A protein has these predicted regions:
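The N-terminal extracellular segments of secreted preproproteins, especially immediately downstream
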Residues: 1, 44, 49-50, 69
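Alpha-helical hydrophobic membrane-insertion segments
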Residues: 12, 48-52, 166-169
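Short linear/disordered segments characteristic of secreted peptide precursors
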Residues: 26, 38-42, 56, 162, ...
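Bacterial N-terminal signal peptides
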Residues: 48-67
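Structured soluble/peripheral alpha/beta segments that form catalytic or ligand/cofactor-binding pockets
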Residues: 2-6, 70-493
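Intrinsically disordered, low-complexity repeat/linker tracts enriched for polar/charged residues
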Residues: 10, 14-46, 253, 265
Length: 493
């Protein structure tokens, strides 16, 4: 949970990663790397909320080890950076609004400490079965610095550039001033300055099953990585990205809540007129685990929407306690779900969230409740309620309303009322909200939101709840219904 990834070191998104790095000098001719995730929590900053990432990393690297850099004979530990210390040291921070360009911004931003690609959705099978799914991939920078072309300087996945600079990590050892630490092979293929983690979950509503799996790896030897054009991000064989190389598209601006957007051509609920709306798409998605395999083709039904202040999503009043955050709230998907060798054709609606930054959750903040609701008729609602330790809502909580034409409207904390009417107690411990009434008078929304299954908790460390929901109620005096996803962080500790 990346970055988590959500958003990493999150004062507003990342409740920061706890990284256990064991440095061991191996008298081996080959480098053995073992990345173990004990606490992988979504370092996600969901829209403005960042997630807790507990990344338990054990990097055993030949003659070198993670956590130390040699500079003029001095050994400097990098563990403070990994654990969060001052998570922004050396990394870029989200301070002011920026210009978004697509497809470039679908790809990685290695100058920031963390980011994530987050997809959720609801699917219907031809035989009447229903599924919910989540695939999230997190990138976490271990040390700051980028190489040529704005990419990580080390030799990594397909998205990396060759070329080494000061601060490169060689065999797990940070190199200062371009000089390799004694005894470390400069050309080590295991060198990396970032790690990736992924969460996959599927809700089989008819069977009453919820299954989740996770993977983690380093950006080396093609084990994990990300690239911008054509877009692709992967951890092992879990992947999100272009099905094949696409011609580079010209920069296309996204829609921000303060900009009036022209209406989409065709029916936005059916995907007509999507050409050029989200350059770089369509994409494919693949993941499998715990007896389920999911393969989908995805095509947007609208342009990317910038959340917050033209894409700058603030989590607290502290400078840099923010992320850059955009969403594609309606994506048509179709493909297959395979369980026990039996394949079901499915189609449905998904949601993409993208965030990157270098901040973390504030000292007063405990977690967040994130809502992504897709209403019949084409509108969408996103809101993240940041929770303080005393149970109050942080005033930096915020959201976005998107009407059927694609026009977006920012929502402040005082414009959204969320009342909890039921709870669910996890067998692992922890009590989660389990039914909500969501009211947004500014857009005439008043709906009840219910999980399709009570238990949609991912037993990662830390644990969190992320699940498919139904909604029913009224919008501007008319009946309203739809589906969506809710994320609950900070309840299962």
């Amino acid at each position: 949970m990346w970055d988590w990834l959500g958003r990493v070191g999150v004062n507003t998104g990342l409740a920061l990663a706890r990284v256990q790095a064991q440095a061991r000098t191996l008298v081996l001719a080959r480098v053995q790397v073992q990345v173990q995730t004990q606490t992988l929590a979504r370092v996600r900053w969901r829209g403005a909320v960042c997630c807790l990432l507990g990344l338990g990393v054990s990097l055993l690297a030949g003659v070198g080890f993670i956590g130390a850099a040699c500079a003029g004979g001095a050994v400097v530990s990098d563990l403070d950076v990994i654990r969060g210390g001052d998570a922004t040291d050396g990394f870029a921070r989200a301070l002011v609004p920026r210009t978004f360009e697509f497809p470039h911004d679908h790809g990685p931003h290695p100058e920031f400490r963390h980011e994530w690609w987050y997809v959720t959705g609801n699917l219907d099978a031809a035989d009447g079965r229903r599924f919910g799914f989540e695939l999230t991939i997190f990138r976490v920078g271990l040390v700051p610095g980028v190489g040529a072309g704005g990419q990580p300087a080390g030799v990594g996945g397909a998205g990396s550039r060759v070329g080494k600079t000061a601060g490169d990590v060689v065999g797990g050892v940070a190199v200062a001033g371009g000089a390799v630490a004694p005894g470390v092979a400069a050309a080590s293929a295991w060198r990396t300055r970032q790690v990736y983690a992924a969460h996959f979950a599927i809700t089989d509503v008819g069977r009453g099953e919820f299954k989740f799996a996770q993977k983690y790896s380093r950006d080396a030897l093609g084990l994990a990585g990300a690239q911008g054009e054509p877009f692709r991000v992967w951890v092992d064989d879990w992947v999100l990205g272009s099905p094949s190389p696409l011609p580079l598209a010209s920069a296309v601006p996204a829609r921000s809540p303060s900009q009036a957007a022209s209406a989409m051509q065709g029916d936005p609920t059916r995907g007509a007129g999507t050409a050029g709306l989200a350059p770089g798409l369509p994409w494919t998605l693949h993941a499998e685990g715990q007896g389920y395999e999911l393969t989908l083709d995805a095509e947007p039904l609208g342009q990317p929407v910038l959340n917050g202040d033209h894409g700058l999503s603030r989590k607290s009043a502290e400078p840099g306690a923010a992320s850059y955050y955009y969403s594609i709230p309606r994506i048509a998907v179709h493909g297959k779900v395979v369980r026990a060798g039996v394949s079901s054709d499915v189609r449905g609606l998904a949601w993409l969230d993208r965030e990157w930054g270098s901040g973390s959750l504030g000292a007063k903040q405990q977690g967040w409740d994130w809502f992504a609701l897709q209403l019949q008729g084409g509108s969408a609602f996103m809101f993240y309620a940041l929770r303080n330790h005393d149970g109050t809502r942080d005033p930096n909580s915020a959201g976005t309303w998107v009407d059927p034409s694609g026009r977006a409207q920012s929502l402040t904390s005082d414009q959204v009322t969320i009342d909890v009417s039921d709870h669910w107690t996890s067998p692992r411990g922890g009590r989660y909200p389990s039914r909500w009434r969501v009211r947004v008078p500014a857009v005439g929304l008043d709906v009840e939101v219910r999980p399709v299954l009570a238990n949609q908790e991912l037993g990662t460390q830390p644990r969190y709840w992320e699940g498919a929901v139904d909604l029913k109620g009224a919008r501007e005096g008319h009946d309203a219904a739809g589906r969506g996803y809710v994320e609950l962080v900070g309840y299962g500790e």
